[in-house]
Amino acid sequence: FYMDEILRTAMQQNYNVSVSGGGANTTYMISAGYYDQESNFEGPDYGRQRYNFRTNITTEYKRVKVTALLSYSHENSKTTTDGSTIANAMRIPTYYYYRQYDPVTGKYLLNDKLTDRNSLGLLEEGGYNKYRNDYVNANLSAEVKIIDGLKLRGVLGADIFADHRYT
């Protein structure tokens, strides 16, 4: 089956660490993580890596409570340029060569019956999209207890992101 030619076993790793604590009026949490996913597609080193960091702190003094949250994520990924790799592989007739590659000419054979695509050729030689993305999320909130059962709360937040794509 042609899917065996374009798919492979891939490793996924995910690591996280966090520290939390506090006292009578203040609590905190800090966490960091790393994620690495190799691609299941044959070809160059497709995959995704992500680093993330998060911190929360809350403090209370008399009738006032303040909370600050900050998170950051950096991601690198490399993907195939063909969005129909699996669909094109499933369209290849079974009577075609098992491996759609001619070692004599060094060329990939085309499936001219249903599509002019060769999924393996596109994965190995068709180029790639490379992404570098950064995300920041920040929130600050303040809460004042006016009377029993009535609180006033204000929230200020920002989402900042920078997405970069290269081919």
Predicted segments, located by residue:
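Membrane-embedded beta-strand positions in outer-membrane beta-barrel channels/transporters
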Residues: 14-16, 52-54, 137-139, 143
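Surface-exposed loop/interface segments of Gram-negative outer-membrane beta-barrel transport/assembly proteins
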Residues: 1, 39-137, 153-167
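Residue-level signature of outer-membrane beta-barrel architecture
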Residues: 21-23, 57-61, 142-144, 148, ...
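Residues embedded in well-ordered regular secondary structure
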Residues: 1-44, 82-83, 122-126, 143-145
